[in-house]
Amino acid sequence: MAGSVLITGASSGFGEASARKFAAAGRPLVLAARRKDRIDRLVAELSKQAPCYGIELDVRDRGAVETAFANIPEPFSDVEVLINNAGLALGLEGAHEVDLDYWDTMVDTNIKGLMYCTRTMLPRIVARGGGHVVNLGSVAASWPYPGSNAYGGTKAFVQQFSRNLRADLLGKNIRVTCVEPGMCETEFSLVRFEGDESKAGSVYDGMQPLLGEDVAEIIFWVTSLPAHINVNQLEVMPVNQTWSPFAVHRDSED
């Protein structure tokens, strides 16, 4: 019997789009995010399509994660799919100029939050005899760009953590997928530039980025494949994005 789908960072972006996609398919949902007002509205809306349960949660707080997951009521507590979506980027300054608090926040959210949610929920998924863990990574894990520094490092962790989860869970009937999107027009850049709408919007000037719905389609697809198929890693970019050529500094530029 299909269990519930738990999505972190469900109040916007990939998380919200994924919630809508799974709700349309009638899957029971556990939606977690820091912004309670948004989660409450989303749960009220999607409950018309599928059973929904909302959690106000900051994944950086280990104790809060453990308490929240332990108190998920039936039938939602039978989590089959864990979508670790909560994450963010802050700033584009070089490593010699960046605010160290930005790095702390990215590490606490993108790495520690991922670990807390996975370690807390995984025993249940093992006990139920199977399921799927989907981790949201980024092309920044593989392709460096100026200002990515700690953000790219955290997403490289997500990539390698996902691979090692696969190794740990061999024989447990649990699939693990790392989905790595490129440029996508969500609230990502708005958060990165601390609410500067002009700066955030300019990131996508003159090109068609991915949309949150595009990534949600991918997440839904990998979780809907026959149970014997595991998509280990899936990197996706808009057509008009590719990896950059090697950067070369010329003496004349000094």
Regions found by a protein language model. Give the residues of each.
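Conserved glycine-rich cofactor-binding loop
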Residues: 11-12
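Conserved glycine-rich Rossmann-like NAD(P)H-binding loop of the short-chain dehydrogenase/reductase
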Residues: 27-42
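The beta1-alpha1 cofactor-binding region of Rossmann-like NAD(H)/NADP(H)-dependent oxidoreductases
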Residues: 37, 57-67, 100
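Substrate-binding pocket helix/loop in short-chain dehydrogenase/reductase
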Residues: 93-95, 99-107
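Active-site helix of classical SDR
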Residues: 118, 154
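Residue(s) in the substrate-gating loop at a strand-loop-helix junction
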Residues: 138
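C-terminal helical subdomain
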Residues: 178-182, 197-245
